Amino acid sequence: MSLTRLLIKDFRNIESADLALSPGFNFLVGANGSGKTSVLEAIYTLGHGRAFRSLQIGRVIRHEQEAFVLHGRLQGEERETAIGLTKDKQGDSKVRIDGTDGHKVAELAHLMPMQLITPEGFTLLNGGPKYRRAFLDWGCFHNEAGFFTAWSNLKRLVKQRNAALRQVSRYAQLRPWDLELIPLAEQISRWRAEYSAAIVEDMADTCQQFLPEFTLTFSFQRGWEKETDYAEVLERNFERDRMLTYTAHGPHKADFRIRADGAPVEDTLSRGQLKLLMCALRLAQGEFLTRVSGRRCLYLIDDFASELDDARRGLLSSRLKATQSQVFVSAISAEHVMDMSDKNSKMFRVEKGKITD
């Protein structure tokens, strides 16, 4: 699946744009603040319903406008799909697929699996566990049909349980929430464990190519003690949870630990090495999806040259080309991406929100 056309209206500093895209590499070149990252963000938003630089909708809609509008055309092997997303200042969204309203953002995410690599993406490695849970959950979402519904229900139940902890005095009063929560928690943890076990070899192989000087290990931690039933954990920790007023154990506390030569990667690797590792993990995840489902990711890479020398840029470029996926790359200078270009690539110049090819 590739994005063949993108229409942008009133998104960030872009008043209007209509882009015909390459199924291969698409380069966005311009000075800082020109709007090149806004194009990447528009694509990301079309597939996620939210921007990656700000959760405040007012900062994403162009100044003095009421809403942004994004439209795209996706070309699959057998058919083309038209998609659209409109979002106003109140945060209300309208999703259209093939001309019909009433669709969910999750449907867009399923149609457009994508991997995002940005200078801020180091949080996958040096941020809190929620970023690594999101990494696993992306894979589970695209590999398990029931994951999104289960995950949404889990979030709702944990929130309700936390609210109930402020009101109850005995565990029996909390049991109705736990009877719903326990099977969901165990199912989501099984999916995460199965996914992490399935992808770990792909990650290790790709990371070895990018960072041969390190031995990297990966471990999934489900959020409560091994070999212990979640029901037992919840009941045993009731008084502590009640004092804390939140549920201290469960899949919402899971983590996916990454170590280099036995130490946390954030304590061992340089910024350039962390970026390489982040790229390797995103590539491995995208390639795993293709291998198990036949579907290809879109790759969005912001500020391609930052933190990487010529050799490392060349390695990333060659691996991206090998995926045969659609790739969007932003850079300050065309010189930084010329080695990636071929006869099927497209180069877009971005200046003050205006885009030309």
Swiss-Prot record:
GO molecular function: ATP binding; single-stranded DNA binding
GO biological process: DNA replication; DNA synthesis involved in DNA repair; double-strand break repair; SOS response
Family matches, as Pfam families: SMC_N (PF02463)
Gene3D superfamilies given in the database record: P-loop containing nucleotide triphosphate hydrolases, RecF/RecN/SMC, N-terminal domain
Keywords assigned by UniProt, alphabetized: ATP-binding, Cytoplasm, DNA damage, DNA repair, DNA replication, DNA-binding, Nucleotide-binding, SOS response
Binding site for ATP: G30, A31, N32, G33, S34, G35, K36, T37
InterPro entries: DNA-binding_RecF, DNA-binding_RecF_CS, P-loop_NTPase, RecF/RecN/SMC_N, RecF_2
PROSITE patterns associated with the record: RECF_1 (PS00617), RECF_2 (PS00618)
Recorded GO CC terms: cytoplasm
Compartment(s): Cytoplasm
PANTHER family hit by this protein: DNA REPLICATION AND REPAIR PROTEIN RECF
Function: The RecF protein is involved in DNA metabolism; it is required for DNA replication and normal SOS inducibility. RecF binds preferentially to single-stranded, linear DNA. It also seems to bind ATP.
Membership in a protein family: Belongs to the RecF family.
Protein name: DNA replication and repair protein RecF
Originating species: Klebsiella pneumoniae (strain 342)
